[in-house]
């Protein structure tokens, strides 16, 4: 989300519309204006289902994936935090936090296989990080506690990272069969909740930067968002 694109209009009645993650975050007028962060499979995990036949795609992850991106006064990204609450996936289950900052990438969780899979195959390919440097993630083994509530917000902490979101502005459903990651189209459905307030602490210090808010009163958008009831198929 350092520079942004405008997405195609997309909603439940047009599930095949192409989706741009970055445009989703920025555009509140379209249902896709959500800042979606979720896990999707790399090409190697997509199975034999053709990109053009969503009916043959199989679930690869079920869970929740809130996200937070902060910006400085010039609009540059100062931090990107991807919180994962994975109920089931092809690489296991558990809670993970992936933190991107200009000085490197930190992954926190109890299962390095799951944490590094999420970081290397998915987060690094998200358009939010287009044009930003990506380094080999540093894995920090630690329990991650996640409390997500579509009524009130999020608290996630572990491995020196503490993320809070509050003031849920909206709750809306989203679905598409055309969400590309690493050159492979995926199907995605979820419930999205943009948040009006958020902050991140890293090793006890408040992470610099502010969230970006936009959209319309009917469809607000924010770079701090909840994403629940999330299912990815590939």
For every predicted segment, state its role:
Residues 2-15, 24-35, 46-234:
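Targeting-peptide/extracellular-domain and disordered-appendage signature
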Residues 40-41:
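N-terminal signal peptide c-region/cleavage motif recognized by signal peptidases
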């Amino acid at each position: 989300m350092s520079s942004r694109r405008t997405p195609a209009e997309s909603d439940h009645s047009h599930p095949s519309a192409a989706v741009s993650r970055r445009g989703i975050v920025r555009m509140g007028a379209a249902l896709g204006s959500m800042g979606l962060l979720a896990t999707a499979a790399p090409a190697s995990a997509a199975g034999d289902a053709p990109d053009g036949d969503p009916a043959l795609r199989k679930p690869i992850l079920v869970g929740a994936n809130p996200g937070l991106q902060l910006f400085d006064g010039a609009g540059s990204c100062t931090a990107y935090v991807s919180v994962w609450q994975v109920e089931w996936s092809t690489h296991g289950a558990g809670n993970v936090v992936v933190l991107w900052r200009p000085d490197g990438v930190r992954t926190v969780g109890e299962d390095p296989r799951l944490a590094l899979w999420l970081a290397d195959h998915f987060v690094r390919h998200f358009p939010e990080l287009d044009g930003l440097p990506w380094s080999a993630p540093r894995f920090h083994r630690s329990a991650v506690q996640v409390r997500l509530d579509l009524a009130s917000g999020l608290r996630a902490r572990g491995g020196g990272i503490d993320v809070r979101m509050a003031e849920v502005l909206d709750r809306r459903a989203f679905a598409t069969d055309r969400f590309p990651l690493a050159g492979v189209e995926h199907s995605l459905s979820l419930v999205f909740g943009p948040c009006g307030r958020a902050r991140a602490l890293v090793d006890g210090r408040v992470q610099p930067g502010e969230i970006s808010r936009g959209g319309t009163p009917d469809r607000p958008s924010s770079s701090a968002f909840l994403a629940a009831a999330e299912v990815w198929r590939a």
